[in-house]
Amino acid sequence: LTSLDNVKRVALNTDGLGQSVLLKGYANEGHDSAHPDYADIGKRIGGADDMNTLMTEGAKYGARFGIHVNAGEMYPEAKAFKDDNVRRDYNGNLRYGWNWLDQAVGLDSIYDLATGERETRFDDLEKLVGTNLDFVYVDIWGNNTGSNDDDSWQTRKLSKEINSNGWRMANEWGVANEYDATFQHWAADLTYGGANQKGQNSEVMRFLRNHQKDSWVADYPSYGGAAMMPLLGGYNMKDFEGWQGRNDYDTYITNLFTHDVTTKFIQHYEIIKWVDGDPVSAGAATNWIPEMEITLKDDDGNKLVLTRGSNNPDDDAYRERTMTLNGKIVAKGAPSRGDRTDADIQNGRKRGTESYLLPWIWDSETGKKVAADDEKLYHWNTQGGTTTWDLPEGWTNLKDVKVYKLTDLGKTEEKTVEVKNGQVTLEAEAETPYVVCKGEEGNINVTWSEGMHITDAGFNGGVKSLEANWTKAGDGNAEIAKSQYSNPMLKLSGDISMTQELTNL
């Protein structure tokens, strides 16, 4: 349920953008424990009850949840582990897999499929979580730990077992399971695997399916070729809950508004035209043909056009992108490089030049368009400063708009900005998110630490929550401080104690 508080924190910081949350360690004792007992939801982290609370309450904030499973290797503590389904070579030797907890042993995937045992284990999980679960991420599938050939036939069968329970399919390798997978870890986690593991770079595939999945080569210029500022962007996976030691919250938010908001905005439209440029040398890729202009439309006929600034990778304008929606500019400039390090982000180095004012007209829970009064605009200015924008239709007749700076406590620092001739002029701090509304708007309603024994266990609610939920004794000082990675903590100084009564024990 700590993850539920993190969902709420991100919801406040993004004013309710959708979230996709992968629960790496939902089973048994945590990550990779007791594979492949899919229904063994970890008791010490709350079991099925808390997991369902996380998913049902998180959905109210636009979050969808998936789990990490394995169908190619298993661990001796698993109930599914037995002599009949271990993978052996022709000499009877075990085929070993990953080794960082207990030694993983290959799970004979042909046996698991033919006997129906794997499908039964997924069905057992479905009885516990139903469609509260959104997707299943199948780790390592395709490296032939479970069979001599994890071929397309086997893969489609595995996908159908997962899809039949109402769950999306996701995989690890960048090119895995093109037909069914909607997310590939190594495509999106850009530091994984090197340039040849960065997802699917077929123009035909992306033309047809860009709006359907996160499987594409994203912006990571040091890889060259398709990774040098793709016009369509690409999901750049960062996080702050500890995977690979990543725990910097502010870096996560900066990355999200630098790369992922624009990528997800574009994915609301379908590609109808793709214009290529002339062949160039782009990093390690020779005779690379960059996309120069891409046109997209939605079901209502709204037209989005993306244009590259130059055909020459040695020209700074190669990274510059202009987006127009129905003829009005909604984004311009060069996004900060996707291979920028966390230290670069933390210290404000190597910033790009992109700024945007993107209309956001979709409900994060349902995906449907919101009422006109609930439409909003996200503003981001990488360098900071003042920019002037043409407002979209439905906004031009307003007298003024309300502008809010977004933080992990929600909308702050309300400003009223006049609308002149259908335009608005915005002043922004560098790499700081803002939301523009048609009128005054309150914050998302949040109750911290639902289902837990302490209210606001992570001190996410700021000073007001501290004062409301903790009793102070003594003359010292209690305050909320941020760690070096921007995660809130209680800081006590002087003669003081803070107490809160535990509940529901």
Please identify what each model-predicted range represents.
Residues 1-79:
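Aromatic- and glycine-enriched glycan-recognition loops and surfaces
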Residues 2-5, 9, 49-53, 117-120, ...:
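Extracytoplasmic/secreted proteins, especially bacterial periplasmic and envelope-associated proteins
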Residues 1, 71, 78, 85-105, ...:
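Active-site-proximal substrate-binding groove within the catalytic cores of carbohydrate-active enzymes
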Residues 460-492:
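Extracellular glycan-recognition surfaces and repeat-rich motifs
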Residues 377-378, 424-425, 487-490, 499-504:
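Beta-strand-rich interaction surfaces with strong enrichment in secreted/lumenal proteins
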Residues 365-367, 384-389, 491-504:
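Short beta-strands within extracellular/lumenal beta-sheet-rich domains
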